[in-house]
Amino acid sequence: MILTVTLNPAIDVSYPLDELKCDTVNRVVDVTKTPGGKGLNVCRVLNDFGETVKATGCIGGESGDFIINHLPDSILSRFYKISGDTRTCIAILHEGNQTEILEKGPLLSVNEIDGFTHHFKYLLNDVDVVTLSDSLPAGMPDDYYQKLIGIANLNGKKTVLDCSGNALEAVLKGDSKPTVIKPNLEELSQLLGKEMTKDFDALKEVLQDKLFDGIEWIIVSLGADGVFAKHKDTFYKVDIPKIKIVSAVGSGDSTVAGIASGLANDEDDRALLTKANVLGMLNAQEKTTGHVNMANYDKLYQSIKVKEV
């Protein structure tokens, strides 16, 4: 079983407009509301793929109830209730653009943070892999993912971390290491303080930096150019075919789902990398974020090329 953790989920609201007019009323006919957050995208894709998955995180208020009520019944909902209201994130789609208004989310108390920590420990009993995705809510210290990873490691669970900024830096500088991290080139550049390119030799060199010691897998997204990955002392380049992209939103989360599935099923390197990239591409072919159409899985799987470099 796979446990997905979304500590700061949201209701994602989409407002499509022909034109966004400022300082006046804009009326919307077709409003879409869905449970949002990177970890929730991961769990929906895992569910589409047929994995047994349970979802946790911190939710509160009517918005939190909305999230629970709008997840598929086959996903085991194990969220931790807090006093604050779960946030709302608004995307205004207008004239080929997307303008976003993102709430910060609730402020968690020390007691609520401690309560979730105990809740997390309890949820580990029957899981093999844990995914940790997205930003931390207000009130949680930067090293909180480091704490959860330490707990998972003590219980023999594999972890996939997909975050950035201070939270990622705290994990890399801490004692407890995740099984997998999945930065993109921009995040890698921020971590290392220098501009990173798709040059293989340069990527090989930086992924052997002491900053990444103890991390079994480092999987770097190269966008349409596929993936560059390091597993222990072996490096891989993953080439992907060109596809018609409907929406790339959530494709990174779908890739995380594939990584988690590969770990949970003890798949070899090539199978894990292939599955992860296929699920990412399948999501990009869908209008709905965090969804894959498995009818196209086998065809795409055969088109992925994984080579050792």
Swiss-Prot record:
Pathway: Carbohydrate metabolism; D-tagatose 6-phosphate degradation; D-glyceraldehyde 3-phosphate and glycerone phosphate from D-tagatose 6-phosphate: step 1/2. GO terms for biological process: D-tagatose 6-phosphate catabolic process; lactose catabolic process via tagatose-6-phosphate. Keywords: ATP-binding, Kinase, Lactose metabolism, Nucleotide-binding, Transferase. Pfam families: PfkB. Transmembrane segments: none annotated. It is an enzyme of class 2 (transferase). GO terms for cellular component: cytosol. It catalyses: D-tagatofuranose 6-phosphate + ATP = D-tagatofuranose 1,6-bisphosphate + ADP + H(+). SUPFAM superfamilies: Ribokinase-like (SSF53613). InterPro entries: LacC (IPR005926), PfkB_dom (IPR011611), Ribokinase-like (IPR029056), Tagatose/fructose_Pkinase (IPR017583). GO terms for molecular function: ATP binding; phosphofructokinase activity; tagatose-6-phosphate kinase activity. Its EC number is 2.7.1.144. CDD domains: FruK_PfkB_like. Belongs to the carbohydrate kinase PfkB family. LacC subfamily. This is Tagatose-6-phosphate kinase. It comes from Streptococcus pyogenes serotype M6 (strain ATCC BAA-946 / MGAS10394).
